[in-house]
Amino acid sequence: MSAGKTVVIALGGNAMLQAKEKGDYDTQRKNVEIAASEIYKIHKAGYKVVLTSGNAPQVGAIKLQNQAAAGVSPEMPLHVCGAMSQGFIGYMMSQAMDNVFCANNEPANCVTCVTQTLVDPKDQAFTNPTKPRWRFYTEQEAKDLMAANPGKILREDAWPAGWRVVVPSPRPLEIVEYGVIKTLIDNNVLVICTNGGGIPCKRENKVISGVDAVIDKDLATSLLAKTLNSDYLMILTDVLNACINYKKPDERKLEEIKLSEILALEKDGHFAAGSMGPKVRAAIEFTQATGKMSIITSLSTAVDALNGKCGTRIIKD
C-alpha cells in the first residue's frame, strides 16, 4: 500500500535540459512541465513526494552571466549563484506542479524551500577540487586565467576537449532546513528542495555561512531521505536501469538486487564515477542506513518502479 508513504525523488538533469538543447527559459519550462506530469502520477498513487534536482546547467549559466557582467555589476560568489539557481528551478517546478494540480481539480499544495547543506570546511575536497564546471578553455587560456587569478584551478577535461575550472565537491553532512521540510511533508505538502544538492554552507561557532563548492545532488538527496526516514529513495535518470558492462555485448540490467550484491559490483568498479557511480553510491547509503528500498530508473517508469515492475530496486539482505 502506498497511502501515506514518503518517496524522496532526485530528478536527473535531463528533466530540465536534454543533451544539445539550448538552455533558454522556454525549453527548460517545457521539459519541467513534462516532468511535473510524471511526478503528479506518483502523488496520485498516494505517495507523499519530496522532489530534488540537479542544477549544473543553471548555476553554470548564472555564474557565466555574472562573470560577463562583472564590469557593470558585482560578480556574486558561487554559493550565491547556487542560491539563485534554486530560486529559478524552484519557480519553474512549483509553477508546473501547481498547474498540474489545478488541471486535475486539486489544491495547489506545493512549495519550494531554499535549502542549505552543511559541509565540513576541512573536507579534503577543498584542497583537491575535482568537479569540472562551466565553459571550456584552450590550454593557453587556462594558464593565463590561473596566472591572473591565484587560487583558481583549471584542469584538462577529456570530453569534449579543453580545460575547465574545477571546484570542490565536499560530502554533504546536514540539511539545515530538515525540520521545516518534515513539517511540510507531514501536512501533505509536496516539497521541492535541495536543488543542486543544496547551497554549500559551513557552521562555525553557531554561525552558518556559504562556501564556494558544489554538492553531489544524489548524495544530498540520499542524506535528506535518510534524515526524513523516507519509505523510498528514487533516483531518476535517462535510463531504465543501472547496468553492468554498459553498452557492451554482455551488458546486464540490474533489476531487484540485494545490498550485498550491488556493493560487490561497486567494489569491482562497474559504475563510472562521472555517471552512474554517484547514483548507485547514494542508493546504497540510503538502503544501508534505513533498510528500505532505493530505486534507480527513468522518469517515465517511476510509478511502475515503485510497484516493483521495472527499474533497479536495491533491497536489504
UniProtKB/Swiss-Prot annotation:
Keywords: Arginine metabolism, ATP-binding, Kinase, Nucleotide-binding, Transferase. Its EC number is 2.7.2.2. One of its GO terms (biological process) is arginine deiminase pathway. Pathway: Metabolic intermediate metabolism; carbamoyl phosphate degradation; CO(2) and NH(3) from carbamoyl phosphate: step 1/1. One of its GO terms (cellular component) is cytosol. CDD domains: AAK_CK. It is an enzyme of class 2 (transferase). It catalyses: hydrogencarbonate + NH4(+) + ATP = carbamoyl phosphate + ADP + H2O + H(+). It holds the Pfam family AA_kinase. Belongs to the carbamate kinase family. Homodimer. This is Carbamate kinase. The lineage of its organism: Eukaryota, Metamonada, Diplomonadida, Hexamitidae, Giardiinae.
